[in-house]
Amino acid sequence: MEKHECGSCTLCCKIQAVPQIKKPAGKWCPDCIPGKGCGIFKSPTRPQICKDFYCMWVNSPSLPDKYRPDKIKFYVSGTEESEFLHVCVDANYPMAWKEGAGKELIDHIRNAGRHMLVFVGSHEYFIQGKNKPIPKSIINYMQVKGQQALLD
């Protein structure tokens, strides 16, 4: 099965910080054409962090279009080998991961036994994968950050 194409989704161009070009998280990249794509996608000047970015929706062709990041207002990154997945939510839609198709996707990932760190603006939350112990690295990280784990 082939990968999804980004198409008009440019959410990673907004949410993700890009230190190489001093782009803060939550602001549009100057090379992004919102709703159209990255203006330098195939250019050698494209920042390395962008080249290395792993969007779960793009790389999971079995996920339906309703879970495309620009539709659910967050992206999920990480690979099968990742200890946990990152869920990065557009700060303009802080509840997106808790309602509608966004919640469906979070529940699907959790029920598959995957741990998630959810980032919403300056807030971070941990969601424990179903029937999986919490890794010590996550416990230590959350204690350092002073956050409480969300355990359902």
Question: Where are the regions that the model predicts?
Answer:
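Short loop/turn segments that flank or connect secondary-structure elements
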Residues: 1-152
